[in-house]
């Protein structure tokens, strides 16, 4: 891990904070404008490892309500079942449909028979492999593609369908510059310092 992120400053003894702790920290520091992006990490390929995507999504939403979180919130997931549940029950919350066509989490499963278990019943091949069209069919408005596979044509297609594009996870300045030139709406990054510096220079 340290080799992958050599610039990261270690913090011995620190653990990943619970969502409630994050909300409390933002309240204590009067950071109501900071957006909370919460990824729902469930897998249809390992159904016994977590609660159902619907249960996890509902637990997150209820915690936000019980803590009276005033920060803008977005939920994102590779498991579109969590997002379609929220579309039905919490339609006012921005939902980002994550996608990737390779690696450990190939949630699109293009060219394979039937619907991908990740896509809430959608068979991506029914839409000619178009992720924006598949998201639109579910009522979604935000797409989070893996940045290396994103093309300008896909960005234009998504925008034509009223879908904003938020590629992940972009840490290299040249990649950031290329994606900004494509016209993406947001960039998900581990290095906001680099992205902000680039935006200021443009």
Indicate residue ranges for each PLM-predicted region.
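Metal-dependent phosphodiesterase/phospholipase catalytic core, i.e.
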Residues: 1-102, 115-127, 136-146, 159-161
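C-terminal active-site rim and adjoining tail of enzyme catalytic domains
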Residues: 98-99, 105-202
